[in-house]
Every structure is written in C-alpha cells, then in structure tokens.
C-alpha cells in the first residue's frame, strides 16, 4: 500500500472527528468554570494530586465535608478564641506596699511613676507595716560598737532613743556581748546607752571554766572599769578569802589602772612552806583556770621574790 494513500486517509479521519472533539473541550471548559466558583480558593490552590485532611482545613474558612456527612460549622481561628488555660494576670500587692516614703518624691517633690509608685508620696499615703513582735525592742550591736549600721533606717534594732518600742521596765539586750575579762561569755545585759534608763553594771563576767569568787567578795569594784589608767581606785578587802595566797594578795589598798595586769601564778609559787599552807593551796591545783592573784598585782611594782621550794626538797638538800 502506498504511504501517500495512508496519509490521506488519516487526514480525512482527523477532519471527521474535529467537530465532536471541539464540543467536548468547550463543555469541559464550561464545567471547569462552574466548578471553580463552587470550590473555595484555598482548596483550589492546593496540589491536585494531594488529599485534603480535616486538620489542614483549620487554616481556611470552610472545609468540604466527606461524602455522606453534613457540612461542619465554621470554627474561629486560634487568634480569635480566648484561651481558658491562661487566666488574666492580676497585679499582686506586696506586703510592704506604701509602708516607706518615696525618696525621690521627698527630695524633689515629684516622682516619674506617679500613682503606680510602690512607695508613699507623703505621710498621708503611709501605711502601717506588719512588724515582728520584737521589732525595735533590742539595741543594735553594730551601731553602738562601730558607730554605724549598714541597714540604716531599715534596721530592725534600736539606733535612737525615739525608736524604742520595748515595754517599760524591760532591759535592753545586745545580740553580741563582749566580756570585760576578755573571755567569751553568754548573752547578758549590756550597759544602757545615753538616753536610756536601764540596770547599772553590777558584776563582771567570768569564764565558766574558772572558779568565780563568792557573792559580795569581788575584789574589783564597778568603778574600776570607768577610771582612767594610772588613777588609784579604792577597793574594799574581801573577807573571808578562799586561800592564804588570795588573802595575801588583798593586802594592798589601791590598784593601779582598771585592769592592772591580771597574772596567774605558777604552781610552784602557789605552794607555801608550812604543811597547812600546802594543804590549803592543794585545792587550787585541781584546775588550771582557778584565778590566783599575786601580791604585787594590785599594788606598786615589787622586786621578784626568790623561788620557793617544797619542804621535801629542802630536807633532801640538807641531808646531802
């Protein structure tokens, strides 16, 4: 068969099918136009080969329901729906709100925070704070020993007599006391500062390890601590004394200085030459902290006494 005849037959067949094919294209184009109006633009913008899920439908305003189901009601977006889990934040008021004066307002008469300031603008806005029951009832240790306090007006202890809120008759106590003897002592009543009426100093504190003298037989009077160094201060003789060595130490009638070199005697010096003296002073050797004062401590300086020996050593040296 000739190729030209085959070509002509194919061309004739194509001309016969062209009107039907054109009608199909026109009808298809009309269907596409009508269907594009009924489908939302958000759905048409997706790829044709991708399935649409209900989760992705939240981003658009309308989602086509699956076959056999009624259309769903439109749901508001996440930016329009109020979140029930996040309650509205309410400003919390501090317990110290308006309990102190505003420093900026007190100095310049104005404050940039205005009504939102946490401090009081004048005595009219000042509130009473809830304080501890012991607030301003004890003396400030740092203020009376160092002359200043890092907390200033916010300190909970007393700085001035006008701040005293303690009950009348209640002694003022320092949190940290220092013993006059230089030894650590417990909590005790301190001498009141100027402007306070408190109990006067009546005794000197001793270390718990040392044996204190009997009541009323303290060899030092309270005035000895307030006297200037080098000024002779009178002293009453204690009776009775605890041992003969202490009795000999109380013979001078004056002391030189408030704390004129309290020295502890060696064990060899505290022993006497007679048996009675040896027996009486033996009790003082039981503890190393018993206060035994020398005869020249409270009086004028005296030449050192020659070292004494026990009677048994004297007899040994004589026999040799």
From Swiss-Prot:
Location relative to the cell: Nucleus; Cytoplasm; Cytoplasmic granule; Cytoplasm, P-body
- Return the annotated region ranges for Disordered: 17-50, 66-95, 180-310
One GO cellular component assignment for this chain's record is: ribonucleoprotein complex
Biological-process GO terms, alphabetical: 3'-UTR-mediated mRNA destabilization; 3'-UTR-mediated mRNA stabilization; cellular response to epidermal growth factor stimulus; cellular response to fibroblast growth factor stimulus; cellular response to glucocorticoid stimulus; cellular response to granulocyte macrophage colony-stimulating factor stimulus; cellular response to lipopolysaccharide; cellular response to tumor necrosis factor
Q: For the region Necessary for interaction with PABPN1, what residue ranges are annotated? A: 96-187
Which PROSITE patterns does the UniProt entry name for this protein? ZF_C3H1 (PS50103)
Chain residue ranges for the region called Necessary for nuclear localization = 88-161
Q: Which ranges are annotated Pro residues under compositional bias? A: 66-85, 300-309
* Per-repeat ranges for P-P-P-P-G: 64-68, 191-195, 212-216
Provide the residue span(s) of the region labelled Interaction with CNOT1. Answer: 306-320
ZnF regions (C3H1-type) run across 96-124, 134-162
Q: What is its main location?
A: nucleus
What does the record give under GO molecular function? Answer: 14-3-3 protein binding; C-C chemokine binding; DNA binding; enzyme binding; heat shock protein binding; mRNA 3'-UTR AU-rich region binding; mRNA 3'-UTR binding; mRNA binding
Instruction: Give yes or no: UniProt keyword Lyase.
Output: no
Looking up SUPFAM superfamilies in the UniProt record yields: CCCH zinc finger
| Keyword Repeat on entry | yes
PTM Phosphothreonine: list the residues. 85, 251
- Which residues does the annotated region (Necessary for mRNA decay activation) include? 167-320
Q: How is it modified after translation?
A: Phosphorylated. Phosphorylation at serine and/or threonine residues occurs in a p38 MAPK- and MAPKAPK2-dependent manner. Phosphorylated by MAPKAPK2 at Ser-53 and Ser-179; phosphorylation increases its stability and cytoplasmic localization, promotes binding to 14-3-3 adapter proteins and inhibits the recruitment of cytoplasmic CCR4-NOT and PAN2-PAN3 deadenylase complexes to the mRNA decay machinery, thereby inhibiting ZFP36-induced ARE-containing mRNA deadenylation and decay processes. Phosphorylation by MAPKAPK2 does not impair ARE-containing RNA-binding.
Q: Which InterPro entries match?
A: ZFP36-like, Znf_CCCH, Znf_CCCH_sf
Region annotated Necessary for RNA-binding sits at 90-166
Query: Which residue ranges have biased composition labelled Polar residues?
Result: 27-50
What is the role of the protein in this entry? Zinc-finger RNA-binding protein that destabilizes numerous cytoplasmic AU-rich element (ARE)-containing mRNA transcripts by promoting their poly(A) tail removal or deadenylation, and hence provide a mechanism for attenuating protein synthesis. Acts as an 3'-untranslated region (UTR) ARE mRNA-binding adapter protein to communicate signaling events to the mRNA decay machinery. Recruits deadenylase CNOT7 (and probably the CCR4-NOT complex) via association with CNOT1, and hence promotes ARE-mediated mRNA deadenylation.
Report what the protein is called. Answer: mRNA decay activator protein ZFP36
The species this protein was found in = Rattus norvegicus (Rat)
Q: What is the lineage of its organism?
A: Eukaryota, Metazoa, Chordata, Craniata, Vertebrata
